[in-house]
Amino acid sequence: SMPATKEQLHEAMQSVGITADNPQEFFIHGYSDREDRHIALPYDMVCAAQVDELNFLAARLENLDASGIAALNAATQRKNGFENIGQLIDFTYNEDFFVHIPEVHNPRELGDYYLNKSGMVQMPAEWKNSIDLIAFGRNAAAQEKGSFTEYGYLVESGDEWEKHFEGRDVPEEYRIMSYPQPTIELDAAPAVQTATIPEAQQQEPRPVIPIVL
């Protein structure tokens, strides 16, 4: 599981026979998540990412609470979604860039939310009853360029998106990709031959030099 350490990655590699002497290529074919913490990352983007990038992403995702994960899931499905793994990582630094309404999934629900639940529209109730909720929600989404997704409605808040990672190197503490050194069994280790020094060539013991106080 990630985030992981270099030692944990090496242990996993060695379990399938991958070492520095046998550096086989391996590929990422998806990911898994916890049942109580579903994360809807773009499959192709995950498979194309580097191990170090995914390790850093996993560490950053630990900073998101349930509402943050829900907003991320919606953001991955919006019209102009994330283009690379760096933008996914940067989302964790830019949670306030989006407004996420998880209970809204279509124009009618958006119209009802804005008209009756948000407190943004002040008018007599009888006037509200005459408004077409579908048309109202559709117009609102078009004007603010919002997106209806499986995980709710998402619209930009107006805050500026700040690049923290995209285009930069993974921080050193999250770089784990390397091949482990092969394990040498003691029985397989070559015998070390000890050279025999002729008695004539053996050094005589050094004389003891007394210390005068």
Regions found by a protein language model. Give the residues of each.
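A generic structural signal for short, solvent-exposed coil/turn residues
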Residues: 20-22, 146, 203
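Non-Sec secretion/translocation targeting segments of pathogen effectors
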Residues: 132, 182-213
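Mixed-charge (acidic/basic) macromolecular-recognition segments
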Residues: 12-129, 156-183
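Acidic, low-complexity, intrinsically disordered interaction modules
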Residues: 117, 123-135, 143-145, 149
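Short, extreme N-terminal segment that most often corresponds to the first beta-strand
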Residues: 1-6, 210-213
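Ordered hydrophobic segments in well-structured contexts
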Residues: 1, 25-29, 145-156
